[in-house]
Amino acid sequence: MPATETADKNTKSANSDTSGRVVRVTGPVVDVEFPRGSVPDLFNALHAEITFEELAKTLTLEVAQHLGDNLVRTMSLQPTDGLVRGVEVIDTGRSISVPVGQEVKGHVFNALGHCLDKPGYGEDFEHWSIHRKPPPFEELEPRTEMLETGLKVVDLLTPYVRGGKIALFGGAGVGKTVLIQEMINRIARNFGGTSVFAGVGERTREGNDLWVELQEANVLKDTALVFGQMDEPPGTRMRVALSALTMAEWFRDEAGQDVLLFIDNIFRFTQAGSEVSTLLGRMPSAVGYQPTLADEMGELQERITSTRGRSITSMQAVYVPADDYTDPAPATTFAHLDATTELSRSVFSKGIFPAVDPLASSSTILDPGVVGEEHYRVAQEVIRILQRYKDLQDIIAILGIDELSEEDKQLVNRARRIERFLSQNMMAAEQFTGQPGSTVPLKETIEAFDRLTKGEFDHVPEQAFFLIGGLDDLAKKAESLGAKL
C-alpha cells in the first residue's frame, strides 16, 4: 500500500486526550478553549459528555477553524441540546473515522460510523479516517469500458462508463431517486460485486424503503449503507458522503474489488456545506453558496476513481434547484462527470418513464472508437431525428402538422415512435404499475432503433411502442393492435 494511504489511516497524534472547555454554543457551532500549546489540528474529532433529559450521550465535534488565543471553532455532528458553557471537551487526536472491512456489508451506519441496525456493531473493526487523499496520479487507470444497464435510453444514447462518475440530474419530483433505486436493482444484481450507498440529506422514509427492497432482492448482503438524512445537523450531512466513500475505498484498495458507490443526493452535500460555511461566518459566494464550493466538490470527486485493476463506479443523483442548470451546485458537479442523464419535466409530463431528455444527456464514451461504429451511427441518427422534431415544434404549434412537407411529416411520426420506444417499465416501479420491469440487451436495442429510424415500423401504431421492452414486446403489442412487424 502507498505510504500516503497508510498515513491516512486512523492513527492518534501526540496531543491526544487533551481537554478544553466550551466557551460558546450557537446552534451546531461550538467554540472551545484549550490550554496553551495544546490546540487540536483542523478536522480533529472532539468528544463532549453531556446529559439531556436524563439521557447521557457523547457529542462529537469536528474542528473547523482556529480562532487564535487557544480558541477553536467546531461543528457538531449531533444536536447540541444540553451542551452548556464550561463542559469539558476531549481532543481525540484524530479525525472522524469509520469501520471498514468485509463485515460492514449488510448493515446501516451513520456518518460517525455507528451501526444503526445493530448498536455497538463494528466498534472493534479497523477504522479509517474519512479525510483521505486521492490516489497518486501514477496509480490512476482511466477506463472506457461500457457498463450495460438494460435500459434502452441509457445504453443507446448515454452509455455509462465502468469505473466512471455518472450523474442523474433533475428538478423536484422527476424520478431521480426511483432511477437510482432502479440502477441498484439492475446493476447490483448483475454486477456481483460490492455496493455502498450514501444517503445524503434525503428523506428517512426513502432510506427505510431501500433497506427493505435490498433485503427482498437478496442484495443487502453485498451492500453497505451509510445515512445522514435531512433531519440531521449540517455537519453530518456534509460528512456522510466522505464516510461512505471511505468504506468504498477500502474495498477498492485493500480487497482489490470493483465497487459501486451510489450517492443520493449530491446537491444536499453542497447545501450542507453552504449551511456550515454561513454558520462559520464565511463570506458567501455566488447565489449564497460557500466560497469553497469547487474545492469541497473536488475533494470528494477526486477520490472516486479507478486505480490499477480496481475501480469505483459512482452513480450520483443531483437535485437541480428550480430546474436551473446554471445554479453553481449542479454546474460545479458537471466538470467531474463521465456521463450525465438529465431528467426532464417536459418528458415526465408526457408519461414517458424514465423521464430522460435524450438531447440534454451525454456520455464521454459515445464514440465510435469505444462503443463501435454501428452503435454510434444509430445513436446519432436517433438524436438527429429527435432534434429535428424539436426544431419543428413551434411550426406545428402555430400552423399545424399539415403545413409540413411530406418528408418532415414522416420524420415527426418516426420521432414520436422513438420517444415512446425510449420508455420502459422499471423494476423499482413494479409495485406501482403492476407491470414487471424489462431488461433489453444492448445488441437488441441497437437493432430495434436501427430498424425504427429506417422506417421499418412506420406502419405500427404509436401506442405499441409505449412502456415496453425489446422487439418481442413490440411484436406482441403491435399484434394486439392489429399490426405486424
From Swiss-Prot:
ATP binds at residues 170-177. GO terms for molecular function: ATP binding; ATP hydrolysis activity; proton-transporting ATP synthase activity, rotational mechanism. One of its GO terms (cellular component) is proton-transporting ATP synthase complex. PROSITE patterns: ATPASE_ALPHA_BETA. It is found in: Cell membrane. Its EC number is 7.1.2.2. Keywords: ATP synthesis, ATP-binding, Cell membrane, CF(1), Hydrogen ion transport, Ion transport, Membrane, Nucleotide-binding, Translocase, Transport. It catalyses: ATP + H2O + 4 H(+)(in) = ADP + phosphate + 5 H(+)(out). It is an enzyme of class 7 (translocase). Transmembrane segments: none annotated. Pfam families: ATP-synt_ab (PF00006), ATP-synt_ab_N (PF02874), ATP-synt_VA_C (PF22919). SMART domains: AAA. InterPro entries: AAA+_ATPase, ATP-synt_VA_C, ATP_synth_F1_bsu, ATPase_a/bsu_AS, ATPase_alpha/beta_chains, ATPase_F1/V1/A1_a/bsu_N, ATPase_F1/V1/A1_a/bsu_N_sf, ATPase_F1/V1/A1_a/bsu_nucl-bd. Residues 1-20 are annotated as: Disordered. Residues 1-11 have a biased composition (Basic and acidic residues). Disulfide bonds: none annotated. It is a peripheral membrane protein. F-type ATPases have 2 components, CF(1) - the catalytic core - and CF(0) - the membrane proton channel. CF(1) has five subunits: alpha(3), beta(3), gamma(1), delta(1), epsilon(1). CF(0) has three main subunits: a(1), b(2) and c(9-12). The alpha and beta chains form an alternating ring which encloses part of the gamma chain. CF(1) is attached to CF(0) by a central stalk formed by the gamma and epsilon chains, while a peripheral stalk is formed by the delta and b chains. Produces ATP from ADP in the presence of a proton gradient across the membrane. The catalytic sites are hosted primarily by the beta subunits. Belongs to the ATPase alpha/beta chains family. This is ATP synthase subunit beta. It comes from Mycolicibacterium paratuberculosis (strain ATCC BAA-968 / K-10). The gene is atpD.
